Regions:
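N-terminal leader/auxiliary helical segments
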Residues: 8-108, 116-284
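Aromatic-lined, polymer-binding surfaces characteristic
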Residues: 113
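Extreme N-terminal basic, low-complexity initiation segments
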Residues: 2-6
Length: 284
């Protein structure tokens, strides 16, 4: 039937200050691929705290959903992406050791997946943007589309945050990893992540697009600044050339992440050394 406009077919929001609501499917799928290859004891930890592992897979990105406008919670998420990750993981794992905190351990294993995938892929994604091939967020959401199609999901109808469970008890665990962000703000962020990513899935012939356009205009936002970043009905042509390299980086990161998560897992027993691979930023 009718060709749908870009705003009807995606789940990505950017406000006028430039905060990006990231795509989610690649991180979810990556976490499942890594989980399948982990030793049985690590799998057991994740199984017992699966909801926290799944939230962890989105790393600091959950904070991007706190509010559409600029705010300190979202800024904390932005700052985390620019900082070297090692100190965060060492501090988190020292708490796991001190308090025998298996829930926090599961969350940090998910967070480790997020860090490994971001730091493996972002240098290439950023280079494609700098060279004018394709904007960063457009390439990322097109990668989500490719992965959805490869795994039999329909990008227009699949709810990418279906595995995210917002609960105050989970927010309390996450707060132990990010003590500078209040528990209630973490809870709001996870709740908003689920709401917004699911809200933007196109399965209603544009009704939600019209609603969000009205909400944005009431808040003084430009609907155009949002709409230009939604997933389009057809694949974006500029994404085709860089896609094989991005897929290669993604695939290679899976076995690498399995090995480095095993290393992270050893810190539950003692203050062991974390290798240099943990000392990059989320941008590589």
């Amino acid at each position: 039937g009718r060709r749908r406009g870009p705003a009807e077919t995606g789940y990505m929001i950017r406000d006028q200050e430039g905060t990006v609501m990231p795509t989610t499917y690649a991180h979810d799928l990556f976490g499942r691929e890594v989980y399948r290859r982990l030793p049985s004891d690590m799998k057991g930890v994740i199984r017992r705290h699966g909801d926290l592992y799944r939230i962890g897979l989105h790393g600091p990105d959950i904070l991007f959903y706190y509010m559409v406008s600029k705010n300190p919670v979202t800024q904390f998420g932005v700052d985390m992406h620019r900082e070297k990750a090692k100190a965060f993981f060492k501090e988190g794992m020292s708490q796991v050791r001190r308090n025998k905190d298996e829930a926090l351990l599961a969350y940090l294993l998910g967070f480790g997946c997020h860090y490994m995938l971001d730091s493996a892929c972002h240098p290439y994604v950023n280079r494609m943007a700098e060279e004018g091939v394709i904007p960063h967020i457009v390439l990322e959401k097109e990668f989500d589309r490719v992965l959805m199609e490869e795994t039999g999901r329909d990008p227009d109808h699949y709810y990418p945050a279906c595995g995210i469970v917002p609960r105050m008890e989970y927010a309390r665990v996450i707060h132990r990893a990010m003590p500078l962000v209040k528990t209630v703000n973490i809870y709001i962020s996870v709740k908003m992540m689920k709401l917004l990513t699911n809200f933007m899935v196109c399965d209603d012939h544009g009704r939600k697009r019209r609603i969000i356009g009205k909400l944005l205009s009431l808040g003084g936002k430009s609907a155009g600044s949002v709409i230009e970043h939604f997933m389009t009905a057809e694949a974006v042509e500029q994404a085709k050339a860089p896609m094989p390299e991005l897929e290669r980086l993604y695939r290679e990161a899976i076995p690498e992440t399995v090995e480095y998560l095993k290393e992270l897992y050893t810190l539950r027993e003692g203050a062991y050394h974390l290798s240099a691979r943990w000392n990059r930023t989320y941008n590589g």
